[in-house]
Amino acid sequence: VKKLPVVTKDMVKQHANEMLTVPKRKVRKGNTSGTTGTPLSVYSDWKSIWMVQAYLYCTRKRYGFTYGQRFVSLRGHLDKNNLSLKIHLSNTLFLSSYNINPANTQFYYDSIRKFKPRAIEGYPSSLYTLALLLSDAGLKLEIPVAFTSSETLLPYQREKIEQQFNTQIFDLYGMTERTISLMEAYNHQGYYEMPGFSINEYLEDGEICTSLINESFPMIRYKSNDVMEMMETTEDNPQIVVKHIEGRKADYLCCKDGSHIILLDFLFKGVKHVKMSQLVQTKDDTLEIYVVPEPDFEDVDKHQIEYNLMDRVGTGN
């Protein structure tokens, strides 16, 4: 594999349609988080999507959660106008990560406490923000297991979340590109590779990964800039272990109602002609959006960004 050339994010962005091995109607489009300022659209076939779910099923079962048990999802599935949604088929309570503010603290507490979940998932910053609000209100929850992903889980976040939720956190690391998947060790001493998911080459300035599960959009020797701190392998433990993951610290947008909006890649969903972007906030009621446009950038792209912002943040917020 190392004899093949490295594929960069810019290369994928320019040649995504040429990389597809099947018609677009047979794949699902996904957008990366754009933590480097350059969001990317990639494609996944249904087989790879089901395989990722199978990996999640096995991993979570190992940590003490079985699919079908009561589960709370505190991620970006719901917008600003929808606080909660229960899906009875999967026994999942979805809560909006865009409405975590002092005014809604009691609602989140009551909803989770009444539901009595076995596990909860969420962005580290979302769970941490809720934990702070619960602490300020003198409230605590009882949730045996918590799963975090999409951002770097910082030590102070882990401590506060585990304290207020009376839980044990297991962190997961993956990419929308489906090129790598790591699970935290049961004893919390580093991260292990998901067997058969990808071939990974760890460098000082990132990693190069080859996906083994997405045949419809093959990512071969794809370069990521997320830096891994490695643990030394020994005869007793020859398996590759990642000690710490850098590069996933997420910024957030402060709203007037006190909520914090994270993973701001949603701003560029459906926007096709932006090379790079930067968001700058100096006051709670002001957001400056800078873009490096492609030649075909037009008003429809600008209006789409404005629509996406209002949809997630809310009018006047």
Residue ranges, per PLM feature:
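Short active-site-adjacent helix-start/loop capping segments
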Residues: 10, 80-82, 129
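Generic beta-strand structural signal
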Residues: 28-30, 38-40, 69-72, 91, ...
